[in-house]
Regions:
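Active-site loop/oxyanion-hole signature of alpha/beta-hydrolase fold enzymes
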Residues: 3-17, 57-99
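Structural signature of beta-strand start/N-cap positions in the alpha/beta core
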Residues: 13, 25, 49-51, 88-93, ...
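Short, hydrophobic alpha-helix immediately C-terminal to the catalytic nucleophile
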Residues: 40, 81, 105-109
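Flexible "cap/lid" loop of the alpha/beta hydrolase fold
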Residues: 66, 105, 109, 116-148
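Conserved alpha/beta-hydrolase catalytic His-Asp/Glu region
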Residues: 12, 131-135, 150-191
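Conserved HGGG/HGGXW glycine-rich cap/lid loop of the alpha/beta-hydrolase fold
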Residues: 10-11, 16-62
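Conserved alpha/beta-hydrolase "nucleophile elbow" surrounding the catalytic nucleophile
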Residues: 30-32, 92, 96-101, 105
């Protein structure tokens, strides 16, 4: 089941499943515009034998915005370490997708004593060809569009972005798009 815990002045949404005595919990970090639900399939497979911790990163899912509005990678790394501390996890296997991958590898680089294993799934953080960036992200980089998107976000744009990041288009169901869209509308999640 979901729960909220206090981390860095935020009420952080997470799911902590599997055996609590697992010596190496698996911590899963989602990508941009996503939520802990990104990892539903992984958690279902892993949680019978492993402690699996999934979290909605600040400004995504049900966690909401950071009080200081600092969304730098360094701030996300500090958040991950604070989360591990709050959950009394001294060492973990850390996995990240997209933005979560960039956060994971930076956490492993700056806090190697906290990350014994690292899994990167289509991690962000390296140079991309402009044409490989989904249209939603390209538009969000434009100052005027970014400002408008804080108030208006067409569902079709969300659907297009989700389709661009899923390897199997058949997995992009209307329900999945609705979840991405609905969570993107949460106050502070488009800052």
């Amino acid at each position: 089941p979901s729960r909220f815990i206090a981390v860095q002045g935020m009420q952080v949404h997470l799911r902590d499943e599997g055996p609590r005595d697992d010596p190496l919990p698996i911590v899963l970090l989602h990508g941009t515009s996503a939520s802990l639900h990104t990892w539903d399939g992984w958690a279902q497979q892993l949680s019978p034998k492993h402690r699996v911790i999934r979290v909605d990163l600040p400004a995504f899912g049900l966690t909401g915005p950071r009080p200081d509005a600092d969304y730098s990678i360094a701030a996300y790394v500090r958040f991950v370490v604070a989360l591990l501390d709050a959950l009394q996890v001294t060492e973990c296997a850390l996995a990240g997708n997209s933005l979560g991958g960039q956060i994971a590898w930076n956490t492993a680089l700056t806090h190697p004593q906290r990350v014994r294993k690292l899994v990167l799934v289509d991690a962000a953080g390296y140079p991309l060809l402009p044409e490989s960036v989904p249209i939603g992200f390209q538009l969000a980089r434009m100052p005027i569009v970014r400002d408008v998107m804080q108030y208006v976000l067409p569902r079709g744009l969300v659907q297009s972005s989700v389709r661009n990041v899923y390897g199997d288009p058949a997995k992009v169901t209307p329900e999945l798009v609705d979840r991405y869209y609905d969570l993107s509308l949460r106050a502070g999640n488009r800052q």
